[in-house]
Amino acid sequence: MTVYLQAQTAVQPTFSPTRFAEGVVVIDAGHGGEDGGAVSISGAVESNINLAIALRLDAIFGLYGVPTVLLRDSDISLHDEQANTLREKKVSDLKNRVAAIEALDEPTVISIHQNTYPSSKYHGAQVFYANGELSLPLARQTQAVLKQVLDPENDRMPTAVPSSVYLMNHISCKAILVECGFLSNPEEDQLLQSSDYQKKLATALAGAYLSYRETVSKGEILNAS
């Protein structure tokens, strides 16, 4: 089951949190609307890539019966109508995303973004996590699967999310933020715009979550770094 949030005068969840048992996955496609996020060296807009991967991830979860909430399912911002400037819209959008997440009972958040850097040499996925030990096992599993599926030479480790990331620092649940690749790298820029690669990314993210969930259900602890 998937539930969508739409921009309203004051964005409210269009679902009743009590309908969902523990285990609902919130899929957050970063940015949206006027806030396009980063722009790749070829002109691709981050928010569109985030959304494409998020929709594919949602579809895969649907095949496995994983209940999901998509914070957005189109190129929109979740800001209040009273927000006028781009800054006001960004702030309102983030606050409404936080409110929607916090209204749920123990969700797991997967926030999808793309990276960029002044140098074009950097590439590869990076997983960040919020709320310390609560999210670290899922972050470890996700980083490991991304390495296995996408780039065996990617030796990045899951990292605590920077304090500057508003959404991840204002929610209390299990949450990871996945920078799927670098839009500033020519090869990865093209890959991230590819339908096949987006499917590969979504499959890796879904597989990581499902294997993590199975591990937790067995009472095992993910200690691998």
Question: Which positions does each model-derived feature cover?
Answer:
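Catalytic-site microenvironment of enzymes
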Residues: 1-225
